[in-house]
Amino acid sequence: MRRRRSAKATGKKKKPQKKTAAKKNKKARKKRRSFFEWLFSGTTRRSGRRFDSLRLFGRDVRLSFWPVFLVVIVLLLAIVVLLQGNSISVDEQQVTMVGLPEDLEGYRILLLSDLNGRRFGDEQATILREIGTLDYDAVFIAGDMVGSGGDPQPFYELLEGLPSSKPVYFIAGDSDPQPVLDVTRDITGTVEQMVLADWILGAIERGATYVDAPVELNVGDSSIWISPADMLNLDAGELANTCEEQMLQEQEGTVLGLQSDHDTLPSTTYRYERAQRLLNAVNSMTAADVHISLAHEPPSDDFLYASSTHNSSEEKYLTQPSLVLAGHYCGGVWRLPLVGAFYIPSSTAERHGWFPAQEDVQGLSTAGGTQLYITAGLSTTDSAPLMFFRFLNRPQISIIELTATLPQSMLEQ
């Protein structure tokens, strides 16, 4: 038998020992890649084929298909959001009212809502340009024009750009600063000047009417009553008596030198004057008058149904409104193809607002026997803070045209 010769005897170098399994695994372990390494890795996971090359910073960079595809999709979506977010849409809606006075046939209302302190161009040029192309008789504003930011200037710019010949009526929304001060101003002036917030007084100075109680708008020989929706189911007489009693007590306390009564008297007087204006409206409205109620958040069916059950002969409550105008939902903010809005910020909706019926999101519907129109508004809502931009949902202004003519769909039945 032949003996094996040692490495020394043969003069050959000894082969290095094989690496241990642990070292092999460590070497074979895949290096974690950053996002940019993944994006510019140059190969696809399946085939390893190169997709394309790009000269970037003086070097040839290889691009992978799927990462680039995803980036392109994100950029396209961002462009869509940017373009649609600054493009105003107009929704024109006819509202049929049986027995509408002839003076009000074809009367057109421009409805705005939910600006939330946003600007559309310098001094609201984009909105005002679109409004300038429309034919309308009055402007109704359904709240949240200032928003939680508290800056009224964008709202003021819009008011200043509207024609002075068109009457403007507005209410506050849930995201707006409080319309009434907690601590009244210690000044000599009207009750409103002592108790109303600066942004409300600023809007009034620019020609708008604050609808904190029913207001009568005369059109020819006919009347439109504009009311805040939160007064629909109030007993006007009882409210006026309660406020008057409290006001008289505080007046007496003020004379006696009670500081607490002196401090609260302006607010109580303001509430009493509101109650008196409500009572006057209840006593003045006739069956021939049109009653339009302004709400920020759309009222529930039960609330509107209750307003239809009051006996007008009792002269306690406002008559059932012919139409309620509202905003707040902002068209659902995010809308999906074939689905529409999948969420609205509503405490009274089914499923807490998730997957609502689309007729409850925007447009004309009937709630509690009353016609209700919801505009999609101009911006977003603080009630859905994660939806801080609109998606597939252009900002909207609405034109409401009153008519006594039945719609074609009803005539064909």
Regions found by a protein language model. Give the residues of each.
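Core catalytic region of metal-dependent phosphoesterases/phosphodiesterases
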Residues: 123-219, 317
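Active-site neighborhood of phospho(di)ester-bond hydrolases with catalytic His/Asp-centered motifs
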Residues: 110-113, 138-144, 148, 167-174, ...
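N-terminal membrane-anchoring alpha-helices
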Residues: 5, 23-103
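N-terminal active-site segment of His-dependent metallophosphoesterases
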Residues: 65, 71-158
